[in-house]
Amino acid sequence: MTQYEWLQTTLFLVLLLAVVKPMGAFMAKVFQGERTMLSPLLVPCENLLYRICGVNRDEEMDWKRYAVAVLLFNLALFVSLFAILMLQHLLPLNPQKFPAYTWQLALNTAISFVTNTNWQAYSGESAASYFTQTVGLAVHNFVSAATGIAVAIAVIRGFARRRTSMLGNFWVDMTRCTLYVLLPISLIGALILVSQGVIQNFSDYKTVPLVQPITYDKPKADGKGNPVTGRVTVKDITIPMGPVASQEAIKELGTNGGGFFNANSAHPYENPTPISNMVEIFLILLIPFALTSTFGVMVGNTRQGWAILGVMLLMMAISFAVLQGVETSGNPLVAKLGVHGVNMEGKEVRFGLAGASLFTVATTGTSCGAVATMHDSLTPLGGMIPLGLILLGEIAPGGVGSGLYTMLAFVVIAVFVAGLMIGRTPEFLGKKIEVREMWMSIITVLAAGVVVLILSGVAMITPQAVASKANPGAHGLSEVLYAFASMANNNGSAFAGLNANVDFYTILGSLAMLVGRFAPAVAVLAMAGSLAEKKYVPPSLGTLPTDKVPFALWLMLVILIVGALTFFPALSLGPLVEHLTMLGGK
C-alpha cells in the first residue's frame, strides 16, 4: 500500500470508530422510546402514523406475534412490489417505455428486495422505470433494512429482559427505525453524494453523438440459422439518467446493494470520486458497527458490545489485509506476458487498489452486495475473500440487524461449547444457555449454509444451470457457489460470469433468499423469547467472562471452525484448485 492508501484507510477507520458510540447510544434511545434531538420534529409524524395504521404503541408482542408480524408485513411488501414490476408498462414515470417484467424475473426481484438481498438478474438502466426504481425498489430498501434492525432490537430485548415473554412491538420498532435512523441519515448521505457528482433527476435518457464512430463485427444468424457476423457502425450513444443519489444513499446505509445501474457502484453516476467511494463505504458499515454499541447500552454491559465489535473489526481487517496482499501480488499468468504489477483488472483507477479492496470487504462482510470492483476479476484467492465472508454468515460486521443477531447466535454457540469444556452451566449476560437456545442458534447459523451447498450441488448436475456458466472448471464452480451463497445470505453481489436470468436461478434463487432471510430471523426471535423468560443468574467465580479478550478470540475461532467444517470441501474444489492451477501456469 502507498502512503496515500495507508492514510486514507487509517483516517476512514478512525472516523468510523469515532461515531460508533454516539450512533449506538442514539439508536438505543430511539428504540427505548426516549427523547432525542429529532423528537420535536418526528414525534408528531410518528403518532400520526400510529393513528392511521391503528397501532397501539404501548402494546407489546411475544416472539410468536413478533415473528408473524414480520412475515405478514414482508408478504404484503412482496405482493406490492411484484404488482409494480408486472404492471410497469402501465405505470407513470416510464419515459423509456420499458415493458413489464416476466413473472419469473418479477418473482425473483420482488423477493430479492423484500429480503434485503437485492440480487439483480437484470440491468437497472435497461429494465426498470423511474416509478419502479423509486416507489418500488427504493421504498423496499428502507423497509427491508428496518425489518432487519427491528428483529435485532427484539433479540437484544430478549437478552436484556427478565421473566417476561414480551419483546416489544414490531410496528413501533420498524416505524422508529425508518423515521429516526434511516430517513435522516439517507437524506444527509444523498446530499453529500450529489455534491460529488451523483446524478438526481427524472430526465429522459440522453442520446449524444460520438466524437468518432465505432465500427465492429456483430455476431448474428443468417436466414438458415447459421452463425455469421455483420458489420455495425455506431455513431451515437444513449446515456441513462435518473434519481440515483436518493436511492444510492439508502442502498448503502441499509446494506441493500441493488444498483440503479448494471455496473452498480463502479458506475461514475453512482460513485464518481474517491470521496464518494469512502462515503458509501462509511454508510455501509455505520449501522452494523453502531448496533454493537446499541446492544451494550440496552443490555447494561457496554464492554460486551465493544468485545463483539472487536471480533467483527478484527475479522474485517484480516480480510482486507489478505485481499490487498493477494491483489497487490498480481497474476503470474499475466506477468509472463510482460505485464507486471498489481491486479487492476476489473477495478476503477479512480478508487485505487486500497479503495477497491476496502469496498469489496465492506460489501461482503455486510449483506450489502454493492460492488465498486468486478469480483469475478479478482485473483482466485482474492475472490475467495468476499466469498468466504459471505459464507461465514456476513458477520464482519454483517447486515443491518442481521449481522448482529447472527453474531449473537455464534456467541451462544461459543458460550455453550466453552461451558461444556470447563464443566460449567453455560451462561451469557446472566442467562443460562440451554438446549432450546442452542437449537435456535444452530438453525440461525447453518440454515443458509445448508441451502447453499444443496442448491450448488443441484446446479452442477442441471443442464440449464451448467449452460449458464461462462467459465468451465474450478472457476465455473466458484461462480455457482458464489451465486447461491450471495442469495442465501442475502448479499446480492455476484461473479458476473454467470447468467442468472434463467428459470433455474430465478426460481431456486428465490427459494434460497426466502430461507436465508426468514429461517434465521424466526429462529433468533424464538431464542430471544426463551431468553426473555429466564431469570437473571448473578455471576460467580465459575462464570465465563464474555467481555474479555480471551473469549473474543475464542468466539472468532468458533466462527472459523464452523465455517471451515461447512464449506472447506466446496472451497477446495473452487478457488483453491483455481489458485493452484494458476500457480502451475495454466
UniProtKB/Swiss-Prot annotation:
The keyword Cell membrane applies. One of its GO terms (cellular component) is plasma membrane. Keywords: Cell inner membrane, Cell membrane, Ion transport, Membrane, Potassium, Potassium transport, Transmembrane, Transmembrane helix, Transport. The keyword Metal-binding does not apply. The chain crosses the membrane at residues 11-31, 67-87, 136-156, 179-199, 279-299, 306-326, 351-371, 381-401, 403-423, 442-462, 507-527, 551-571. It is found in: Cell inner membrane. GO terms for molecular function: P-type potassium transmembrane transporter activity; potassium ion binding. It is a multi-pass membrane protein. The system is composed of three essential subunits: KdpA, KdpB and KdpC. Part of the high-affinity ATP-driven potassium transport (or Kdp) system, which catalyzes the hydrolysis of ATP coupled with the electrogenic transport of potassium into the cytoplasm. This subunit binds the periplasmic potassium ions and delivers the ions to the membrane domain of KdpB through an intramembrane tunnel. Belongs to the KdpA family. This is Potassium-transporting ATPase potassium-binding subunit. The lineage of its organism: Bacteria, Pseudomonadati, Thermodesulfobacteriota, Desulfuromonadia, Geobacterales.
